Amino acid sequence: MRALVQRVSSASVRVDGTTVGSIGPGMLVLLGVAPGDGEEEARRLARKVTALRIFDDAGGRMSEPLGDDREILCVSQFTLYGDIRKGNRPSFTGAAPPGHAEPLYDLACELLGAQRGEFGAAMEVELVNDGPVTLLIET
């Protein structure tokens, strides 16, 4: 699994003009699933994301975890497995097929306690980066 994690002041996701997920301060997690991923990778990713110490403490030092006063918005993102080593058109053969990816995306969202986008839908994601702080996590 790959997750692109961004610290945000706010984030939301819309499908067909309707907001399906929205958070205040917290993390936006763009999540991609590979063919070899399973439940263990989803669990490991969720543990890692929720333990990340990417929020400022009282002294302005990045050392606080998510905690109870921040939220997560998780959006499926198969394009994280896009390969552009040959040519200019990305190949997505490194991404899991939807039938394999969707249950793992659902599990990861559940474990993260996240608001979520709609798997497989064309979505509009809006966010306000905080920092910015952006991390790539691979399991």
Regions found by a protein language model. Name each.
Residues 5-13, 21:
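N-terminal intrinsically disordered, cationic/polar leader segments
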Residues 78:
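Glycine/small-residue-rich phosphate/adenosyl-binding loop
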Residues 45, 75, 133:
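Residue-level signal for inorganic ion chemistry
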Residues 3-5, 134-135:
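Short beta-strand scaffold segments in enzyme catalytic cores
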Residues 125-138:
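C-terminal edge-of-domain segments
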Residues 19-69, 82-110, 115:
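Compact, glycine-rich, soluble single-domain proteins
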Residues 110-128:
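Divalent-metal-activated hydrolytic enzyme cores
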